[in-house]
Amino acid sequence: MEEKQPIINAVPAGIDGCGHYRIIQPALIMQQLGADLTLSPAAHFRTFGQNITWTQRMCNTSLLERMVKYKETTKQRFVVDFDDLLWLYEGESLPDYNLCRAKVNSEENTAGMAKYLDKLADKVTVSTDELKKSLLQFVDESKITVIPNMLAYKEWYHAQSPRPKKDIFYFAGSYTHYDNVNKKLGDFSQNLVHFLGNKKVVVKSLCPYFIKPEINYKASRLTTYANDFWKETRNVDFIIAPLANNVFNKCKSDLKYLESAAVGRVCLVSDFPGSPYSGAHPYQKIPEGTTTTGLKYIVERANEHYDEILKYQYEYLNKRWLDNNIGLYSEVLK
């Protein structure tokens, strides 16, 4: 009789250290060799007896409906987190250039949030004050806590490196923030394209196809891990984190500014009323509508004051280490 192949659920205690070497790596190789194996972040038995579910971006109507029924059955408390605007707020949601617009139906999400979110969420956490304001149409203010994005010190303490002074730029805008099919630049303004035309540029993820001939660019292979961001940016002088002036971007956080501070690079940021980068140093701000000549002046000035801006950025970051602020999460998850 043929021996039946076992079905394995591999559950490491953590993603680094012994968990990495004794469970994760052996499991990945066993998968490659044909084992019926799932590498899981949590075994099902660990959920027995839990009384809080902590989850993110619950805005899909059918999912919200099922989760409300699940909550009624299990009597659990739900803590729900949001870090982006995925519903209608002040008549807007995802801008027309955003790649995710097709799969995020704002009207449907808004209807689902209005019907189910207050029933589901005992507490809601958000990354910005503006995002909190947008949720007041669905949830009582007493349920909402603003916890800004932060960096874990153990992932970033090693990331500083001397700048190369090669006049190389790293474009850190999301690849979802422009529309290749309809040639909409979104956060990547035409003036910025003209300015970068004779510069060396590393572009995070994907470069808009229709401007490739206009800039001297190298594709980034960045993942979300801190180590990769450090590697990708160690040979650049400036990180550019552009945002168009719209409701969606006003709800976003200053995470790219924190990451730039951690790797020791000056971050050039968009400046408009309600910009998430309002707390940046004045010499690194790019006002809305800045011309190509204006961009040249801003970069020259930032070069002259590079160390001053770096110091400012790091002082800003020092208030936002996750290790020193973990109590914000502990308080919400009581």
Where are these regions (language model features)?
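Conserved catalytic-core segment of nucleotide-activated headgroup transferases in glycan assembly
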Residues: N9, A13-Q25, N149-R234, Y257
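Membrane-proximal helix-turn-helix segments that form the acceptor-binding/catalytic region
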Residues: K69, T73, R101-V124
